[in-house]
Design a protein with these regions (language model features):
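A ubiquitous short alpha-helical element
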Residues: 4, 22, 68-71, 147, ...
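Solvent-exposed, amphipathic alpha-helical "stalk/arm" or coiled-coil-like segments used as scaffolds
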Residues: 10, 14, 55-59, 197, ...
Length: 343
């Protein structure tokens, strides 16, 4: 979908939320539940983070991933409560261990139903007593807990900061930039408004700002640029695509931990470079590169196709050396720093 969707921004945000609420099929062991979670994230990808967070806290796949099914009154499991605050909504240092214990009580009773791909609240397993969370006291349950957490000023800064980190730069935004982004996020917690605000920031297009593309984003962009739809490939080629992503260390629905995938230089290892080269060769082998082949300046033509404004002298020299073979040229261009690292 990332390679073929008419609205790639929505698919990119769906991918972002998959990494943010990182859930692995390895433990969930239900493709149906993983697909249902993916649909939920797509539905809310560009909407209100409130709606997304409310849906995710009782998402069946996430419940199984973070031991929600074993969270019951009298014997709470703290895993979901802790990760929801630390990794999904607040960040480290903005809650206490007491908050985790009390939040776990608020989330008791929710169980994933594999047969219906839904979650339901089992009243006899829910702790309906008074809880003390983040300085507030009340009979908190799942949805009221979410609203309480998202109402903290730290939450807006955290969520906006994560969007910036994954979409713009590993360097945090300046204080004035962060304030503008938080203002755009607003009380509605509007993801689309934040994205508009991000793209309006000078830093978004500053050549000094760079971000190493995640393998899945790199491959999806390459498939889209070269006009290759994964669904049109034969089984062997699709298997090779998946093997290539595995070699790069990023397979959808199989994040290494609840913290999601690595970022930045972690994707620039020697082994990753070899895997990227093989993937680029595979995609180029199925691409229609007629326009590049006919161009007098093939390096510029492939740059236009990939959305690269300019090649460095070093990359130009490398491209010149393979200009006689348009598929080899495309492979080298796809693995060049100017494409692997967006700036």
């Amino acid at each position: 979908r990332m390679a073929a969707a008419d609205l790639p921004s929505a698919e990119r945000l769906t991918w972002f939320w998959h990494g943010h609420f990182a859930t692995s099929e390895q433990k969930v062991r239900s493709p149906q539940l993983m697909l249902a979670q993916n649909r939920t994230q797509r539905e809310h990808a560009l909407g209100s983070f409130t709606d997304l967070a409310r849906a995710m806290v009782v998402d069946p796949a996430l419940l199984l991933w973070l031991d929600g099914n074993s969270n019951k009154a009298g014997k709470p499991n703290e895993n979901l409560a802790r990760e929801f605050m630390e990794l999904f909504t607040l960040g480290v240092g903005h809650y206490t261990e007491d908050d985790v214990r009390e939040a776990a009580r608020a989330l008791t009773g929710w169980t994933a139903q594999r047969d219906t791909t839904t979650a339901k609240l089992v009243p006899k397993r829910h702790d309906d007593g008074e809880k003390h969370i983040l300085g507030a006291t009340g009979d908190f349950a799942a949805q009221s807990f979410v609203d309480l957490v998202l109402g903290r000023p730290d939450s807006a800064r955290f969520v906006v900061g994560r969007l910036w980190f994954r979409l713009v730069s590993a360097e945090p935004p300046a204080a004035d930039v962060l304030n503008r982004l938080v203002a755009a996020y607003g009380s509605r917690r509007d993801v689309r408004a934040v994205l508009r605000a991000i793209t309006a920031e000078p830093a978004f297009r500053d050549s000094a700002t760079s971000l190493v593309k995640q393998p899945v984003e790199w491959l999806a962009g390459l498939l889209r640029a070269f006009g290759v739809r994964p669904g049109s490939l034969d089984e062997q080629a699709r298997t090779q695509l998946l093997a290539g992503l595995r070699g790069l260390g990023q397979v959808p629905f199989l994040p290494p931990s609840v913290g999601g995938w690595a970022a930045g230089g972690a994707w620039l290892t020697t082994s990753a470079g070899v895997a990227r080269l093989h993937l680029a060769q595979l995609v180029a082998g199925h691409a229609d590169l007629g326009a590049v082949a006919k161009a007098s300046d093939k390096a510029s033509a492939i740059g236009d196709l990939l959305g690269v404004d300019a090649w460095s002298d070093r990359t130009k020299a490398a491209l010149a050396g393979v200009a006689g073979d348009v598929r080899q040229l495309s492979t080298v261009a796809a693995c060049a720093p100017e494409y692997v690292v967006s700036g």
